[in-house]
Amino acid sequence: MILKNAEIFDENFDLVKADVAVGNGKIERVGQNLEGADMHDFSGCVITPGFVDIHIHGCVGADTCDGTREAVSKMAGHLITEGVTSFCPTTMTVPIAKIKKVLSVIKDCMENPPEGAAVCGANMEGPYISAQRCGAQKADNIRKPDWHEFKDLYEGCGGIIKLVDIAPECDENHEFSEHASRFCKVSIAHTMADYGQAVEAFRHGVTHVTHLFNAMSGLQHRSPGVVGAVFDDSSVSAEVICDGFHINPAVLRIAFHQLGEDRTVIISDSMRAAGMPDGESELGGQKVFVKNSQARLADGTIAGSTANIHQEIKNLISYGVPLRQVIKSATINPAREIGEANKIGSIKVGKQADLVVMDKEWNIVSVFKNGKLNKN
């Protein structure tokens, strides 16, 4: 199959006019004037790598913590329609027994893939966070970071955990981060840490920060906070929710400028209300109320998002964030964070043919997963 006459983001993320040849689920050739059977004319369109969402709790009424294959399958089937070709189902701060069950379901979905977006591993948001900055996480289920407990979880699920969150001020002698970082990404999240504590965490294995600005200390001129520590350390990547609600658009522009094009990771952080009408929903065992697509707990606390990666890409472009950085932040950067950049995340010969075709207004025209056109 040949995808012809479009502009593409090549393996260096330069926007060029080129054709893409796909076969056996892989990208076989990229170049000018390619010929072959089954040609698709995408004149006037732009082709990007498939989007990668490494932090998503749920959508269309399903949630990772439902702990069922049906829930993850429903998520996968919906996400592909929004251009997401790979994702990490993300747990909440729920009891350890529930986390074990959810991890087993995610493992099954990796080994026996449902239709739609591919499940690339699990993201553990909690339970090793701060009760003082828990946000929409249920405080009753918060636990002190326990390396041995996490090791049992990791080995018990066959090593599918790609990210695990901690509040570093709760990690005594940095034992958890030093050990866990040998197996997966360790990320700061839901924390009361100050600048100095974040810097120390980065020295002991933490290389990632969850939903930058949200549920952490912000940047002030006399108190740089976790945000300042991230800006200050080029080895740390940061997730960013780009719905324009969690973070003001001007602050998004500043953050993307400061972090540069290789450290920003667009996430949805969406919950089961995403893709659904406004109304009452649920997240991590707590009631959520969605009004004007904004999700909050009864006390007004922001409770996840109802956004999706494609929508956030369009937002960032409209905010004036450089196009190249926007696309990298939705594709190769998240793929790199979960150790999948050798397979997905860029349009490069030999990689999976996960591709999104958009028109010049950035509306999705077609989505290809492993070279197959999504029929939805």
Residue ranges, per PLM feature:
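Divalent metal-coordination and catalytic microenvironments
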Residues: A6, V20, G25, G44, ...
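Active-site core of metal-dependent hydrolases
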Residues: K151, E155-M276
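His/Asp/Glu-enriched, well-ordered alpha-helical/loop segment
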Residues: G225-A238, G244, F256-S268, A274-M358
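Divalent metal-dependent hydrolysis catalytic cores, especially in the metallo-beta-lactamase
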Residues: H57, S73-V102, A117-S130, C157-D171, ...
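Alpha-helical scaffold segments that flank or form the walls of functional sites
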Residues: C45-V46, I54, T64-A117, N141-G156, ...
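Active-site gating loops and adjacent loop-to-helix segments of metal-dependent hydrolytic enzymes
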Residues: G77-C88, S130-G158, F202-L212, S223-S237, ...
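C-terminal cap of metal-dependent C-N hydrolases
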Residues: A6, R336, S346-N376
